[in-house]
């Protein structure tokens, strides 16, 4: 559990926790309408098959955060937890170079000074990492965005290790979810986490959109919740990623954004080029 978090906090830590977080409402106007913009405490899930642009979207949002305000960024810090060992620093640098009006090694280093990268190799490693993060959020009041790519990386390993007991299979991820909830709420963060499609859609899924909405985006949503309920209940906003099948648009991707707070459903198209994500 998260009992290890409970201790007396100093005045400095209290101020960092309550006052130091900048708003991320402007993180991507093309993706979030005003009423659906992420606010402190929000948890958003990017869901879809491999190769549908989820990690590229994370690079895009990371760049938006760590770029200086003079270059259209938010100038805030980001902590990126990589569980797939797929993070490409050169790719992030390339995106930054394309978005800076005058790119130089000094400016790139200045941007990357607001970026923190952590690797985790198992669900237990992830849990221990989350336990250790409180002091970091206390000492970095500009750290506003937590990214987890991906939360489903250890699903099959945990299933095997848990044997036939679903409770044991989900035990570590359930504790991770509880710690994520506490960190996000106590330190007024926004969390983006990716999950990969490994189950086929169930027609009776409780996550299915309404009949009218389903007609609009039926081909884009292939979702069946398979992670623990503790995680499912935390998500405020879910985005379903897919790649266009049309051979003429092999570089085009789409996502269906479902905000569970407002129950809104919107579809977006984007391409991925050398400079990163571009909305159509």
Swiss-Prot record:
Superkingdom to which the source organism belongs: Eukaryota
Gene Ontology molecular function, alphabetical: ATP binding; ATP-dependent DNA damage sensor activity; DNA binding
Pfam families reported in the protein's UniProt record: Rad51
Outcome (variant: residue 258 to C): Does not affect function in double-strand break repair via homologous recombination as shown in rescue assays of XRCC2-deficient cells
Effect of substituting residue 248 to E: Does not affect function in double-strand break repair via homologous recombination as shown in rescue assays of XRCC2-deficient cells
Major subcellular location class: nucleus
Database matches in InterPro entries: DNA_recomb/repair_Rad51_C, P-loop_NTPase, RecA_ATP-bd, XRCC2
Gene Ontology annotations for the cellular component aspect, listed alphabetically: centrosome; cytoplasm; intracellular membrane-bounded organelle; nucleoplasm; Rad51B-Rad51C-Rad51D-XRCC2 complex; replication fork
Impact noted for substituting residue 164 to Q: Does not affect function in double-strand break repair via homologous recombination as shown in rescue assays of XRCC2-deficient cells
Example GO biological process: multicellular organism growth
Consequence when changing residue 47 to R: Does not affect function in double-strand break repair via homologous recombination as shown in rescue assays of XRCC2-deficient cells
Effect of mutating residue 61 to I: Does not affect function in double-strand break repair via homologous recombination as shown in rescue assays of XRCC2-deficient cells
Keywords: Cytoplasm, Cytoskeleton, Disease variant, DNA damage, DNA recombination, DNA repair, DNA-binding, Fanconi anemia, Nucleus, Phosphoprotein, Premature ovarian failure
Entry-annotated residues carrying Phosphoserine: 10
CDD domains: XRCC2
Subcellular location: Nucleus; Cytoplasm, Cytoskeleton, Microtubule organizing center, Centrosome
Membership in a protein family: Belongs to the RecA family. RAD51 subfamily.
Disease: Fanconi anemia, complementation group U: A disorder affecting all bone marrow elements and resulting in anemia, leukopenia and thrombopenia. It is associated with cardiac, renal and limb malformations, dermal pigmentary changes, and a predisposition to the development of malignancies. At the cellular level it is associated with hypersensitivity to DNA-damaging agents, chromosomal instability (increased chromosome breakage) and defective DNA repair.
Purpose: Involved in the homologous recombination repair (HRR) pathway of double-stranded DNA, thought to repair chromosomal fragmentation, translocations and deletions. Part of the RAD51 paralog protein complex BCDX2 which acts in the BRCA1-BRCA2-dependent HR pathway. Upon DNA damage, BCDX2 acts downstream of BRCA2 recruitment and upstream of RAD51 recruitment. BCDX2 binds predominantly to the intersection of the four duplex arms of the Holliday junction and to junction of replication forks.
PANTHER family per UniProt: DNA REPAIR PROTEIN XRCC2
Quaternary data: Interacts with RAD51D. Part of the BCDX2 complex consisting of RAD51B, RAD51C, RAD51D and XRCC2; the complex has a ring-like structure arranged into a flat disk around a central channel. In the absence of DNA, the BCDX2 subcomplex XRCC2:RAD51D formed a multimeric ring structure; in the presence of single-stranded DNA it formed a filamentous structure with the ssDNA.
Name of this protein: DNA repair protein XRCC2
Species annotation: Homo sapiens
Lineage: Eukaryota, Metazoa, Chordata, Craniata, Vertebrata
